[in-house]
């Protein structure tokens, strides 16, 4: 059976096409991140750009070769984008009945510890499922550096694992943009402006120019939240930090703690949910 997995974030979507056929080892890892196995194809697109959505139609139609895959989707971009993606899928496959994943109180041996489980964002929940699948039995700090930066904690328990909760703060690009828009004389920077000078300034606790001072200040805020959470968890026992999201490379340069890059946790979680129980 072929499966199409789609992770729709606030600005971009990522997708994976996998099936039950054997797969060569080189297809299992892409960009340093483990992908669902068997994994055949994958990609990304800016979902608000019609041309990029249209390009998906041809790609998916070719992969389907006249069949209709089982489709699993985690969407945090809202109903307008959901409707647009429904149209893309219908163009590619004809009539479809995708599984729009929702947050639940538990999945397998992972328990959702939110006071109101359905309030937890579906991306955070499915990403936690993927992280737990990837590293079962481990206590995890899952950091997603995207439009928002989220820090989520999964702890190992005697009979499985528990999603404990986490933190949400403005993402790096939001911090940079908000500072510029709400001040009269500070320039607007983007994530690509947070380079080596900003990283040095974070470590030196100061910058000798405004550009690096802004970039380093926002990086230090991101790194400070992550490192504080990591230290608190490390004080209880072993913990592994998984770093993902579009700004992960910029944030990584400011961290003074061990971490691992893994940018496909939501796709891994969708794959786990799609497999028969």
Swiss-Prot record:
Disulfide bonds: none annotated. One of its GO terms (molecular function) is ATP binding. Belongs to the type III pantothenate kinase family. InterPro entries: ATPase_NBD, Type_III_PanK. The gene is coaX. Its EC number is 2.7.1.33. GO terms for cellular component: cytoplasm. Pathway: Cofactor biosynthesis; coenzyme A biosynthesis; CoA from (R)-pantothenate: step 1/5. The active site is at residue 123. Pfam families: Pan_kinase. ATP binds at residues 7-14, 147. A monovalent cation. Ammonium or potassium. Its main location: cytoplasm. This is Type III pantothenate kinase.
